[in-house]
């Protein structure tokens, strides 16, 4: 090996051992599981270190080979021999691993393996055996390891090492062989072997390892098994004690199997949770495993072996040959003491017959380091026996890194000392110190963390719920927890914390005990804590009981600003969860409060000691865990062993000190506790029990205490009062029934007994009692009885209510009753008698009515309502019976007077069965209780010899008292100035706190120390994080300088932080602290100035206040807020406008601003650079982005924040939200526009964590509002100027339909409705309400006055609103808003949002981008130069972690992503952008933006937008965009599209579709006697309309009124357009062979109505764009106008369309079958021929057909150029057209055809066409599609004669004033010209030229 290790190893450990600074031992392993791998281990070692080991291997080979060749009675070696060298050189020749594991083989191999490891180590250290031995304190071997140990104790050179190895090998050989031979035979069957293997016990052998039992349990097990075995030669024995819970039993295999069978009976199954089983009733977590050892070593079975070995050996070894102590493995005796006597028999017997007492031997080693050389993991066995005693174990035969506190072999070779192992007593034991007053105090980890003695009071309901008791404990100087579990509302919890904080010394912190089992409660409680910590309330910690959260949840808790978090685990698994949390947060203090099962109140099923014994080592490996013991404690003598750690010594463990002690129920008898005197007396009288007996309380009262199951399902100790014993009885009889139905059945079957017992014994009596005093159920009680019973049990009569929430509960019941009987009870009554009187007076006789069933359910619901104290009675025997009984059960121990009969025996009084023994004095002051315990501890430590340490006095700090240098920092001194400048190197610069430590030095009470190192400062009695320290603390950057100014005598006068800003070469001071007297301190902040060359500064003043308990920094607050406002006014406000005189109701104007291209370009460039590459390439043009409005309005928006009337600290300003909204019909902003902004405060409200200020602004152009901006600013802090609050906002526009006389009466009875004409009839009208609500508040924060004003208008059928009156409502102290409440009940918002059924976005729904690294460019572009965004020092001083990205910058980035996603290329479609800032965005944060189209509103897309921090998942932006759709057109098709069942799927699916269909159908049935729905659904061929009765006559008259003129002459007659209908007709039948749906008079209204329904559906979904284009194809034009305008009422339009259909249907003569000779056909010229047959060619063809046949043939619809045309004509002409088109499609050279050729093709088909009759069904051709079902040549010249008739009819139906040009201009595209409608002269001229319209001609002449 020497050739492999040429370098010298300077082992620090060896040197320390030689110098006496460390003691070193060596240990060797023996037989065990490693037997199976012993040869492979030797093989691997030889492969690596062959040359080094060659002498030893050869010696071993020669020795063992020779011994194996000797004859032996066993004949064991006759077959294989012992050819070590051959097997190592050729492993394939080696015997099997099972054979090699047998004792004759494994014994010598194990010894050789140990010696090889030892040899390799010495060679690596370049030490000979003598040199190394001289460093050793002693040596030991486990079992056969004693042979190797004896060898190294003897060897002092390499030569003697080989000699000693030979002796050890010979002993090993003969012991292994003789033991194997002497082993009792195995009589175990194959089935039994298989049984052991299947149970995980392994292959049966002569030795069985047992893990998990203590020694007494193992000995008992051995005794029990031996009693079951008939013969002594079959007995088993305890052979090895390896650790406290690891033992090995020796004996015959079949006997050891009997042990396994016994273990199976007591062993817990794998994976079974036993935490809910009492510890002493659990099955053992024990393992049994047979070891691959072939003889029962350390037993009397081998008593003859020693003699046989001695007879065979030819060597000897005496004690005097041992150079170092060799310890015997049973007695621990040093075998050197044998001197000249042979030790051979002793070491042989130590392996064969003597038991191994390994833990005792390890303790006797007395070394600080132990080297384990194997074989196997001997290090683990040593570690288990020595952990906690300061012994470091190094495993030398394992080259892998160490684990579990065991070192790796590299530690021996290291030039640095290996880490020292923990000595639990020394490291964690208590120390005595002298405090600053010279008093002796105890110091532990708990005292260091909490700055309080190591005795605390735990959170406990109800005792530590009351803040005043907690305050008393804290004022006594002790740590205590406020029990949050006793609070059911945020308000009361917060009030208690505030009152507690105000009552305690400022240097003390509050800790709250919270219950994790109630996730809803702990969520709001943590939120309250977060809020109060930010405010500066001295909340430092929480203790979490009833569960252990995950490390991630704890991360969130830590983030709220806590200093420590404690847990109360209830099992070993829970302890491990706490350890996991501590490991996840290694720098954060974690408390572990262990109480076990004997604790008062809630407790586990665990023993106090065993779980800690098993986990103490794991706990102490976490340096951040503070371990506290509780349960059963009450005095000094019983707690001191836990502080000192001596409690574990009696259990054979090293001392295990706890860091502190907690008391719980012990303090319930304290004078300051709110425990009722009767309850205190009962506690004092209770006997209690010792630790050995407490567990019997689970079954029976023990020492006056019983265990019951609490409302949380956990065991809880209480005094065994009558009430608690009834609870226990219910637990067993009722609540143990888990099946809900069976439990309810049992309860009902025992109803009378349960009620009787509740009333007799329990704290919660039965509620139901009638007027006669009988027990009844709730549904049998009257309203009077219910109220009376509630008042009886919940109040103290005239003395108020037991709990304030119960008054609210009673008032809720009163309201239920009032609503039931339609009356309102006076709400001002607060005392129980007053409430009952008012109730009975108002309800009159109704009070004696039995509760309505609905009200019974409501009463039970209000009794269960969250946020209120549960009721003090049981109201029902239902499925909630357990909750009624158990919920909120502890408070009456503090209010015995509230119990029935003031009977304390009814109460539930928590108390520990062990701790109660210590409560012997009634009303003992809590300080005495705690002081007595602490004083006992101090006295005990003094008596033990502990000497108090002397507190070191600290000098006034001066820079020259510190170290000379700091790595990476250049320090220069010039007279009275010291400069620290960071070098620019590749290494990270030093952390600022390292540099500060250097600057401040060791002084603890100088002003610089307090400024830069104190964690807290004080402002107006509030404790706050030190902003000076925060401003300095960060990683200092290269080039930055800290400059220290000194006085002449060397004291520090000023410290300045200087940095170069934004590329400037010169340094600027950004922070300076200075003091000339060491008391008064000035702090100056000078952030960078962007928009001015004049630097802006902000100064603060502090005073160093020195008190008896230490010094503190106090901020001088006068003028502080004014200075901050003045600073921000210089940043934000125009210098030419003074805001000092402005008030909260003032208007604030910005200066007129021109939108300049350069300014906008700079802004958009900054935003663009901050986005992802794909968005940077996005370059929309046109209007100015809506985000830029913030730049234009910034001055006006921020001016209100700087007025004196707004009392706030602008350093705590947060931008909460902003909302940009374009005004209706406003043109988007463009370059060159001149704008001006006016703003005002529209809302000012105080919230628990601060003040919310809403500023609303109007951005105006030419005095017209273009954009409204509403922004919210939140100012963190506590405010009490509630009277300054107000809210002013526009309500949504409401509409109310006055559809009944009742509603009209309701409206007219409202005093707030003031009509211009009070007598106006409102019936049938729809009213629109446009309102503003203004609310003010009083000094208590309640509503002071409510004012609602606005206008009320009549909604006209035209869609316009006509003002008819106003709304005016004003009332002081108004609850709710009566006006808006009325409108919500009886009206509806005009504009409603329609959520999408499937929200989403196809592309670009997720965008990733990175926040800007710096914000200075945005600050300059946006004019928002708030230093919080650009100056880290300023931001940290203000309480932020560092600079944050402007909220509006982030908003602009996110909005740009949305703009890109929706494709708004000209920025004209964004109409609204509303964003809420949910979290801070830090420079370089990765953001993930997600967008989703969620709804439609008034034709606009509503986009939900969220942005998240991609690393943390925290939401930072919640936004909503309102985006116009791209310009949309709505096109309505014409006749020919009808089909049976059309529109019915929508009818069945959507209510708005059904409503319009039904409305149209109802109208046509009433007016014309037919159901359009039936026609659509069934398409009948005939329809007969009867004219009988009044209705029939009216219908006939309606048909007869539909007339036409016989001519255009003045005297022309009117005739009915329905042929054959006369005034005497009794019926009329319509018929159509294809179905009436294909008859024009019915198809037209059906198609038009269906299309209007489709549009209505789109409108209801919110997708109709109000400004969209619309057009209709032929008939569709009527549907388009009907759907998209209000030019004609719906019913009138249906009549018009029906008339049109009738007129067209009857425009032509029909034959006897009702047929005409005409139809229509669609044609596609492109399908005739791709080349040469275009529109012109097709027109020629149509004209040729017309000319050659003389029949009607015209192109009437030009739909798609060259692709779709519609022709009207005679059926024969249409037939010819189809045939010719087919011929042309087949022609090979269509482009060569002449006009004559085309003419010939037409004339070819004329003869055949002449033979056709009008019953022919035209068929589809190559390029033609007949429109079958149409038999009218629409749009053709044949119908021109009907135009004037129809015009005249139309004029009678259209009311010109109803036509609103704005609905038509630019939107409607008429068929006739195909251009958007206009009123311009040019448009009218164009239409006239196309149509030849005479009226238009006259109009044009008039316009001229």
Swiss-Prot record:
Catalytic reaction list: acetyl-CoA + n malonyl-CoA + 2n NADPH + 4n H(+) = a long-chain-acyl-CoA + n CoA + n CO2 + 2n NADP(+); holo-[ACP] + acetyl-CoA = acetyl-[ACP] + CoA; holo-[ACP] + malonyl-CoA = malonyl-[ACP] + CoA; a (3R)-hydroxyacyl-[ACP] = a (2E)-enoyl-[ACP] + H2O
Q: What EC number(s) does its UniProt record assign? A: 2.3.1.86, 3.1.2.14, 4.2.1.59, 1.3.1.9
GO cellular component labels: fatty acid synthase complex
Do you know which SMART domains this protein is assigned to? Answer: PKS_AT
Keywords, alphabetical = Hydrolase, Lyase, Multifunctional enzyme, NAD, NADP, Oxidoreductase, Transferase
Task: Extract the coiled-coil ranges from the record.
Answer: none
Residue ranges, annotated region (Enoyl reductase (ER) domain): 447-691
Pathway(s) this gene product operates in, as recorded in its UniProt entry: Mycotoxin biosynthesis
Does Hydrolase count among this protein's keywords?
yes
GO biological process annotation, one example: fatty acid biosynthetic process
Per the record, which residues fall in region Acetyltransferase (AT) domain? 24-395
Partners and quaternary state? [Alpha(6)beta(6)] hexamers of two multifunctional subunits (alpha and beta).
Full protein name: Fatty acid synthase beta subunit hexB
- In which organism is this protein found? Dothistroma septosporum (strain NZE10 / CBS 128990)
Q: What is the lineage of its organism?
A: Eukaryota, Fungi, Dikarya, Ascomycota, Pezizomycotina
Query: What gene does this protein come from?
Result: hexB
């Amino acid at each position: 090996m020497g050739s492999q290790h040429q370098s010298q190893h300077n082992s620090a450990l060896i040197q320390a051992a030689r110098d006496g600074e460390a003691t070193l031992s060596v240990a060797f392993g023996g037989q065990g599981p490693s037997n199976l791998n012993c040869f492979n281990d030797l093989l691997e070692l030889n492969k690596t270190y062959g040359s080094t080991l060659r002498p030893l291997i050869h010696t071993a080979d020669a020795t063992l080979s020779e011994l194996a060749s000797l004859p032996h009675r066993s004949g064991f070696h006759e077959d294989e021999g012992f050819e070590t060298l051959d097997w190592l050189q050729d492993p394939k020749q080696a015997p099997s691993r099972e054979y090699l594991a047998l004792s004759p083989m494994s014994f010598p191999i194990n010894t050789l393996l140990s010696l090889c490891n030892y040899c390799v180590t010495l060679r690596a250290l370049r030490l000979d055996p003598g040199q190394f031995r001289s460093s050793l304190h002693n040596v030991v071997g486990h079992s056969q390891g004693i042979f190797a140990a004896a060898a190294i104790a003897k060897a002092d050179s390499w030569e003697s090492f080989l000699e000693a190895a030979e002796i050890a090998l010979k002993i090993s050989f003969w012991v292994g062989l003789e033991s194997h031979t002497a082993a009792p035979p195995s009589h175990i069957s194959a089935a039994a072997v298989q049984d052991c293997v299947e149970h995980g016990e392994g292959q049966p052998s002569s030795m069985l390892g047992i893990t998990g039992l203590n020694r007494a349990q193992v000995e008992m097990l051995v005794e029990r098994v031996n009693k079951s075995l008939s013969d002594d030669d079959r007995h088993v024995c305890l052979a090895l004690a390896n650790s406290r819970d690891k033992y090995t039993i020796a004996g015959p295999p079949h006997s050891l199997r009997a042990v396994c069978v016994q273990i199976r009976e007591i062993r817990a199954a794998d994976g079974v949770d036993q935490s809910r089983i009492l510890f002493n009733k659990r099955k053992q977590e024990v393992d049994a495993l047979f070891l691959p050892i072939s003889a029962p070593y350390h037993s009397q079975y081998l008593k003859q072996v020693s003699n046989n070995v001695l007879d065979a050996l030819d060597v000897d070894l005496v004690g005097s040959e041992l150079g170092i102590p060799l310890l015997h493995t049973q007695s621990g005796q040093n075998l050197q003491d044998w001197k000249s006597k042979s030790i051979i028999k002793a070491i042989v017997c130590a392996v064969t017959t003597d038991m191994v007492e390994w833990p005792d031997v390890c303790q006797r080693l007395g070394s600080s380091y132990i080297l384990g050389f194997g074989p196997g993991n001997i290090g683990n066995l040593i570690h288990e026996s020595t952990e906690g005693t300061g012994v470091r174990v190094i495993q030398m035969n394992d080259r892998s890194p160490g684990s579990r506190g065991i070192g790796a072999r590299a530690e021996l070779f290291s030039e640095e000392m290996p880490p020292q192992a923990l000595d639990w007593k020394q490291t964690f034991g208590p120390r005595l110190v002298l405090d600053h007053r010279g008093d002796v105090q105890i110091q532990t980890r708990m005292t260091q963390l909490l700055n309080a003695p190591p005795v605390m009071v735990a959170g406990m309901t109800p005792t530590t719920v009351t803040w005043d008791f907690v305050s008393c404990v804290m004022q006594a100087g002790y740590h205590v927890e406020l029990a949050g579990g006793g609070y059911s509302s945020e308000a009361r919890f917060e009030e208690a914390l505030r009152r507690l904080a105000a009552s305690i010394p400022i240097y003390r912190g509050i800790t709250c005990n919270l219950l994790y089992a109630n996730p809803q409660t702990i969520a709001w409680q943590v939120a309250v804590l977060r809020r109060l910590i930010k405010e500066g309330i001295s909340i430092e910690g929480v203790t979490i009981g009833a569960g252990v959260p995950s490390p991630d949840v704890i991360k969130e808790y830590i983030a709220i600003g806590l200093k420590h978090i404690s847990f109360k685990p209830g099992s070993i698994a829970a302890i491990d969860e706490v350890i996991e949390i501590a490991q996840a947060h290694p720098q954060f203090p974690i408390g572990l409060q262990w109480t076990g099962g004997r604790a008062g109140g809630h407790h586990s099923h665990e023993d106090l000691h065993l779980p800690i014994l098993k986990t103490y080592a794991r706990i102490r490996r976490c340096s951040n865990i503070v371990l506290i013991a509780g349960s059963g404690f009450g005095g000094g003598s019983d707690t001191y062993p836990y502080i000192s750690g001596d409690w574990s010594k009696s259990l054979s463990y090293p001392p295990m000190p706890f860091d502190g002690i907690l008391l719980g129920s012990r303090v319930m008898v304290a004078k300051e506790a709110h425990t009722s005197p009767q309850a205190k007396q009962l506690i004092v009288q209770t006997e209690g029990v010792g630790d050995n007996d407490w567990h019997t309380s689970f079954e029976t009262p023990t020492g006056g205490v019983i265990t019951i199951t609490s409302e949380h399902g956990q065991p809880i100790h209480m005094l065994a009062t009558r009430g608690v014993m009834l609870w226990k009885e219910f637990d067993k009889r009722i609540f143990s029934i888990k099946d809900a139905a069976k439990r309810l059945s049992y309860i009902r079957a025992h109803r009378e007994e349960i009620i009787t017992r509740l009333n007799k014994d329990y704290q919660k009596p039965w509620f139901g009692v009638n007027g006669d005093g009988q027990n009844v159920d709730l549904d049998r009680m009257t309203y009077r009885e219910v109220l009376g019973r509630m008042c009886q049990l919940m109040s103290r009569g005239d003395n108020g209510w037991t709990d304030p929430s119960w008054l609210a509960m009673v008032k809720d019941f009163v309201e239920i009753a009032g609503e039931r009987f339609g009356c309102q009870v006076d709400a001002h009554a607060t005392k129980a008698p007053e409430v009952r009187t008012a109730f009975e007076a108002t309800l009159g006789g109704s009070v004696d009515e039995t509760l309505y069933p609905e009200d019974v359910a409501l009463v039970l619901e209000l009794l269960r309502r969250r946020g209120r104290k549960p009721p003090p009675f049981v109201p029902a025997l239902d499925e909630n019976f357990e909750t009624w009984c158990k919920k909120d059960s502890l408070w009456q121990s503090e209010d015995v007077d509230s119990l029935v009969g003031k009977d304390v025996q009814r109460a539930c009084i928590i108390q520990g069965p062990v701790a109660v023994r210590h409560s012997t004095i009634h009303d003992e002051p809590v300080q005495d209780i705690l002081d007595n315990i602490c004083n006992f501890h101090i006295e005990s430590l003094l008596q033990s010899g502990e000497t108090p340490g002397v507190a070191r006095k600290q000098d006034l700090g001066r820079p020259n008292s510190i170290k000379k240098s700091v790595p990476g920092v250049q320090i220069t001194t010039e007279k009275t100035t010291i400069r620290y400048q960071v070098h620019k190197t590749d290494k990270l610069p030093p952390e600022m706190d390292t540099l500060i430590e250097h600057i401040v030095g060791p002084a603890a009470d100088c002003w610089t120390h307090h400024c830069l190192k104190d964690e807290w400062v004080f402002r107006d009695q509030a404790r706050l994080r030190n902003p000076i320290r925060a401003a300095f603390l960060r990683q200092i950057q290269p080039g930055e300088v800290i400059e220290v100014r000194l006085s002449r005598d060397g004291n520090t006068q000023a410290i300045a932080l200087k940095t170069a800003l934004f590329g400037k070469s010169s340094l600027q001071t950004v922070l300076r602290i200075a003091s000339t007297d060491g008391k008064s301190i000035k702090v100056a902040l000078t952030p960078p100035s962007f928009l001015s060359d004049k630097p802006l500064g902000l100064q603060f003043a502090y005073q160093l206040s020195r008190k008896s308990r230490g010094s503190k920094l106090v901020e001088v607050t006068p003028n502080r807020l004014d200075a901050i406002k003045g600073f921000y006014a210089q940043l934000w406000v125009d210098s030419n406008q003074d805001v000092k005189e402005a008030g909260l109701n003032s208007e604030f104007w910005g200066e007129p601003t021109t939108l300049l291209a350069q300014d906008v370009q700079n802004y958009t460039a900054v935003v663009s650079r901050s986005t992802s590459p794909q968005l940077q390439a996005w370059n929309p043009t046109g209007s100015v982005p809506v985000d830029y409005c913030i730049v234009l309005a910034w001055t006006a928006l921020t001016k209100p924040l700087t007025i004196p009337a707004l009392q706030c600290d602008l350093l705590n300003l947060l931008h909460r939200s902003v909302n940009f909204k374009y005004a209706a019909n406003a043109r988007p902003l463009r370059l060159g526009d001149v704008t001006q902004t006016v703003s005002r405060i529209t809302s000012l409200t105080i919230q628990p964590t601060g003040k919310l200020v809403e500023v609303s602004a109007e951005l105006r152009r030419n005095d017209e509002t273009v954009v409204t901006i509403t922004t919210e600013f939140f100012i963190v802090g506590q405010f009490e100027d509630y009277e300054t609050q107000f809210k002013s906002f526009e309500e949504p526009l409401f509409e109310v339909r006055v559809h009944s006389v009742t509603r009209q009466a309701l409206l007219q009875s409202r005093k707030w409705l003031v009509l211009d004409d009070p007598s106006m009839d409102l019936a049938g009208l729809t009213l629109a309400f446009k309102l503003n609500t203004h609310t003010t508040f009083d000094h208590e924060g309640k509503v002071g006055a409510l004012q609602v004003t606005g206008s009320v208008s009549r909604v006209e059928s035209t869609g316009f609103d006509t003002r008819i009156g106003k709304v005016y409502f004003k009332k002081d102290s108004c609850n709710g808003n009566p006006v808006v409440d009325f409108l919500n009940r009886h009206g509806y918002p005009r504009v409603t949002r329609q959520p999408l059924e499937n929200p989403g976005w196809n592309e670009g729904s997720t965008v990733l981008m990175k926040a800007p690294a710096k914000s200075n460019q945005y600050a300059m572009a946006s004019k928002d130069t708030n230093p919080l965004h650009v100056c880290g020092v300023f931001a940290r001083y203000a309480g932020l972690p560092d600079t944050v990205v402007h909220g509006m910058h982030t908003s602009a980035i996110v909005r740009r992503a949305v703009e890109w996603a929706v494709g708004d290329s000209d920025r004209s479609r964004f109409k609204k952008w509303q964003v809420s800032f949910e979290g801070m965005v830090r420079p370089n944060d990765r953001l993930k933006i997600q967008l989703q189209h969620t709804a439609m509103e008034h034709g606009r897309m509503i986009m939900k937008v969220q942005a998240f921090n991609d690393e943390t998942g925290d939401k930072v932006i919640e936004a909503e965009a309102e985006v116009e759709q791209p310009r949309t057109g709505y096109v309505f098709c014409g006749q020919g599209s009808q089909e049976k069942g059309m529109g019915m799927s929508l009818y069945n699916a959507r209510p708005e579709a059904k409503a319009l269909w039904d409305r149209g159908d109802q109208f046509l049935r009433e007016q014309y006697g037919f159901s359009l729905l039936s026609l659509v659904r069934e398409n009948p061929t005939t329809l007969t309309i009867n004219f009988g009765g009044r209705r029939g006559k009216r219908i006939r008259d309606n048909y007869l009124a539909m007339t036409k003129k016989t001519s255009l002459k003045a005297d022309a007659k009117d005739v009915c357009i329905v042929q054959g209908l006369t005034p005497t007709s009794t019926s009329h039948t319509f018929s159509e062979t294809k179905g009436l749906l294909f008859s024009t008079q019915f198809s037209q209204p059906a198609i038009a109505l269906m299309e209007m329904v489709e549009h209505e559906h789109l409108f209801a979904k919110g997708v109709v764009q109000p400004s969209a284009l619309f057009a209709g194809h032929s008939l569709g034009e009527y549907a388009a106008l009907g759907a998209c305008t209000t030019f004609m009422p719906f019913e009138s339009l249906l009549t018009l369309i029906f008339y049109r259909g009738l007129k067209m249907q009857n425009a032509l003569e029909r034959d006897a079958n009702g047929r005409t000779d005409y139809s229509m056909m669609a044609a596609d010229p492109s399908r005739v021929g791709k080349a040469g047959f275009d529109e012109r060619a097709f027109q020629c063809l149509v004209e040729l057909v017309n000319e050659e046949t003389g029949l009607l043939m015209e192109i009437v619809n030009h739909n798609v150029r060259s692709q779709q045309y519609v022709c009207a004509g005679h059926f024969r002409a249409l037939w010819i057209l189809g045939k010719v088109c087919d011929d042309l499609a087949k022609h090979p050279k269509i482009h060569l055809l002449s006009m004559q050729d085309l003419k010939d093709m037409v004339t070819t088909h004329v003869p055949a066409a002449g033979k056709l009759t009008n019953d022919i069904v035209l068929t589809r051709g190559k390029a033609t599609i007949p429109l079958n079902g149409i038999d009218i040549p629409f749009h053709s010249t044949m119908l021109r004669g009907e135009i004037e008739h129809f015009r005249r009819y139309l004029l009678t139906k259209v009311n010109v004033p109803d036509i609103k040009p704005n609905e038509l201009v630019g939107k409607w595209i008429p068929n006739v010209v195909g251009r958007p409608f206009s009123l311009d002269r040019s448009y009218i001229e164009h239409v006239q030229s196309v149509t030849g319209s005479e009226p238009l001609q006259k109009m044009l002449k008039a316009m001229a």
